[in-house]
Amino acid sequence: MIYIGNVFTFGFLANKNVDIKSREITWAEFDQALQGEFINYMGHEDVARMVGLEQNRISISVKSGDIVYLAQYDGPRLEEGATVLPQGATLVPLKVEVL
């Protein structure tokens, strides 16, 4: 299964005894993931809007073989309703593979 969200925690793991591989990817690779089938669990409304998704606060449970794409916000607290990132902030595209 493929998931797309803005955060990843160990609480998402169905089995805590797995290996995880993560790496920064390009926005082109992130955008390519948006073209296929995926489960949107984007919990932050403004980050979701910035990557072209709707907010969808759901619980997920990932297992071996699943892939999670993230738009990870890095910066000062994002003001509610933001449509652009504040100075010094970035969105980092990441790919997390549960092995």
Segments from the language model and where they lie:
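Acidic, low-complexity, intrinsically disordered interaction modules
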Residues: 36-79
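Phosphate/anion-contacting hairpin/loop surfaces
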Residues: 18-33
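Generic beta-strand hydrophobic packing signal
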Residues: 7, 23, 94-96
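Generic N-terminal initiation segments characterized by hydrophobic and/or small/turn-forming residues
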Residues: 10, 27, 31, 67, ...
